[in-house]
Amino acid sequence: MKKIIFKSFLLLWTVLLACSCNDLLDEKAYDFVSPEQLGDSESAASQLVTGAYNTVITSFIAPGSYLYLTNMDCDYASGASWAFGNVGAGNPQGFWGIDHMWQGSYTLIHRANLGISKISAMSNLSQESKQDALAQLCFLKAWAYFNLVRNYGPVPIFRKSISEGEAMSQPRASVSDVYAHIIELLEQAEGMYSKDDAGFVVGHASNGAAKALLAKVYVTMASGAMSGVPIVVKGGDPNIFEPQSITHIAKTVAGYESFDPAKYYALARDKAWEVINEYTLFDNYMDVWAIGNRNKGEHIWMAQAISGDKDYGNTICHDYVGIFKEDGTMEGNWYGMRDHWYLLFEEQDTRIVDGVIHRYASDGISNGKVIYNYYPRWYADKVENKE
């Protein structure tokens, strides 16, 4: 009798456990809205597009790793030794954000692919807004692949989301195939609203942004394919004060052999003219940096960061330019440009006269006076001589 009761109890427990496991495997979203919960509406499409745009900030701008990986190893970047021990010394493997470019780009591609799948199936939004939403997601995918191919060469192409049936393990596509896909995406992205259309959302990309990026893609293909052409750059021994002219002979970048430089330079020129005719430059150089001019004038597409926010802020400005505190000292400003960069400009060039912070207070005080830092270092003589 005891055995019968025990077996009955065991059977009941097994059935209950199986039911519980099925319930556990059924995912329920409590603290976020899943794509399936959005529904079919203008608002649903907007949220899917916004979710993809969010990746630009959270994976590239807010961490700061995007600019570090693409700029730290240039000839003119400078800063403290602790900041240039890996990427700035040509050794990105030791950098904390080494994977951000790869992961961020493919996260953006995944979200854009998912958005394209969901929006394509919607029927309760206008044809115009549907086309615009799909074109924006194509633009974001193209931007991500353009980052990938320039930094890694051959990379996998995911034409649709993994959750929609795309195989997770994709082989690396050739450089030429990646560029062909980028061009295809940007040609579709030209279907976005223009910046002057009533449906355009400020802060989003427009068809002008698609044209501008396509022109940049063409010129990158052309320049990478060049061979045997002399290229003169400014540089030289760091002990030499004035930058020296150095001549290099261009060699075709691996993977760019099939591109015709003349053809793609011509395509870049023609596409760039379409952009030039649509946008205007600001009258004054410093207007470029005015907060009130964001997303206006010559700003074709901007990352929409939130000042002071650790998740959605722009750490690049904090780390490179710095932020003035109430006492006049500066927070951040860890990285900057070498004196050689400054000397590339004529002395009265507005870009360095007004566009460079030449003096800022340090944290120290000597004999009751504030100690200042100067850039470039000889600017201290100008101040002392009241020039």
Which residues make up each language-model segment?
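Elongated scaffold/linker segments in the mid-to-C-terminal portions of large proteins
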Residues: 42-44, 49, 53, 80-100, ...
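Conserved, well-structured interaction surfaces
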Residues: 39-61, 79-152, 165-202, 373, ...
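Short, well-structured active-site flanking segments
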Residues: 28, 149-160, 226-233
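Membrane-proximal, proline-rich intrinsically disordered regions
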Residues: 21-70, 96, 288-289, 293
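Short, surface-exposed recognition loops and adjoining beta-strand edges that mediate ligand/DNA contacts
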Residues: 63-76, 194-212, 223-322
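Bacterial Sec-dependent N-terminal signal peptides
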Residues: 15-41, 182, 215, 230, ...
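Sec-dependent bacterial lipoprotein signal peptides
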Residues: 1-19
